[in-house]
Amino acid sequence: MSAPTLAQALRDAARAGLGRLDAQLLLLHALGRPVHDRAWLFAHDDDALPEPARARFEDHVARRAAGEPVAYLLGEKEFHGLALRVDARVLVPRPDTEALVEWALALLDAPAVAVAAGDAPRHGSSGPSVLDLGTGSGAIALALQRARPGARVDAVDASADALAVARDNAVRLGLPVRFAQGDWLDGAPAAAYDLIVSNPPYIAIGDPHLPALAHEPAAALVAGADGLDDLRRIVASAPARLRDGGWLLLEHGHDQAGAVRALLAARGFTHVASRRDLAGIERCSGGRRAGPPGRSADEDLGRATGSAGATVK
């Protein structure tokens, strides 16, 4: 039996139910070529698919058709310009989470945060201090550290397996994020932070979409009967670990913004707001720990929260 051409292999993948982009990425990976080199496929669609690339591709097609994420098959996922290594030990970073990163960066640039960060040295640095809870692959923490190298970024996860992935990403990217194992804020270093960010589990136990996520770690996805269990815990404990005027930013489900804003307001946070993702969905919400800011600081923070996509409640 003759080897199929690359074009035939892509048609076979389509018949197996794969989308065109997924099939192209997996074929490039099987051939040992960069996954961004899709133009090469168009120029070589009549080339034969040799062994063992054919066997690798057919295996990946079958696994993708069974629901395994493309990122796990490739071993890599791009997030906020970073090429992160990922596997079944961690949740696949989603583009939606970049809305949380952009909001955090806007707050870190606000003069009010810079002034608070200069009040006292922490970890030998006068830059702002950031804590990422439930870091997983390290996506949020590493994106913030790369974009703001003067910040001191700590990251916590309860999973030793996830932390191994995150640490590997940090070493490979040369980013000095500090990692610690523990249960939310119980695992954080003994410090007060200017900014706490988190993309915690927020899917309800009975959510009908869960079967489609069966290949990803359930502990990173599911949070009780209404999906809010971990969000409640973080909101309740965060004020004790925030400096006066510090911010808490949380990713949540597409229909949870109102509930999360209510949790933040009930805990005494001010400037409570939500920010929309690229699809126009309120994807993350946050608030500011009450403190004694001056008038100009409030105005600076208002600009940071009111910029593109934010809805102030």
Model feature map: region roles:
Residues 26, 67, 97, 140, ...:
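Residue-level signal for inorganic ion chemistry
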Residues 1-41, 49:
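Non-catalytic accessory regions of SAM-dependent methyltransferases
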Residues 226-287:
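Conserved Class I SAM-dependent methyltransferase catalytic core
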Residues 28-107:
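Conserved AdoMet
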Residues 98-212:
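Conserved SAM/SAH cofactor-binding pocket of Class I
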Residues 109-129, 290-313:
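Intrinsically disordered, low-complexity terminal tails and inter-domain linkers enriched
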Residues 200-230:
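Mobile active-site "lid"/loop adjacent to the S-adenosyl-L-methionine
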Residues 83, 152, 176-178, 270-273:
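Conserved beta-strand segments of alpha/beta enzyme cores
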